[in-house]
């Protein structure tokens, strides 16, 4: 019963869309109405408000970290509990019950989850994102590369033997890549927006 309650709680935590909440609190347009229409930090940055983008990034990462940390802190379900909380909070961000199941792509939330699973895993994955983003200026490309490397880092650190958390990390990576399928098409067509590019007028 504890595992079930923790999983549901993790999903509800994940369902809080900071992109929408922060934008509303700061009097900005709903991020689902412009740019990529994705309620995430990168799209909020297209509004031109860096503070809102940073708050969105921190909030989305924090909720991922919090959901997993709470399960680990109270020892709920061991590694299975951690794996379920990780998947649940991630799915909450992707399909938030509070916002008609229209959520973001999960990059910041996944980063928070990985930091809670193990700081080295989270930092290695975040560093991968930063390196790709710095050199290529594409948030989506950085996310895709980080998603590919996250399971590899996890296996390198912890191995694969009877490790439900490794499967959770792999599942998040697959989901994150799938959520970026439109970005993949734009990258291949040379039409993807670069980091910091503002929303188009009337978009």
Curated annotation (Swiss-Prot):
NCBIfam families hit by this protein: glycerol-3-phosphate 1-O-acyltransferase PlsY
Protein's job = Catalyzes the transfer of an acyl group from acyl-phosphate (acyl-PO(4)) to glycerol-3-phosphate (G3P) to form lysophosphatidic acid (LPA). This enzyme utilizes acyl-phosphate as fatty acyl donor, but not acyl-CoA or acyl-ACP.
Q: Is this entry keyworded Transferase?
A: yes
Q: In terms of one coarse class, where is the protein primarily found? A: membrane
Record's bilayer topology term: Multi-pass membrane protein
MF terms from GO for this chain are: acyl-phosphate glycerol-3-phosphate acyltransferase activity
Q: Which domain of life is it from?
A: Bacteria
Q: Give the organism, scientific name.
A: Burkholderia pseudomallei (strain 1710b)
Q: Which cysteines are joined by disulfide bonds?
A: none
Enzyme class name = transferase
Q: What is this protein called?
A: Glycerol-3-phosphate acyltransferase
What would be one Pfam family of this protein? G3P_acyltransf
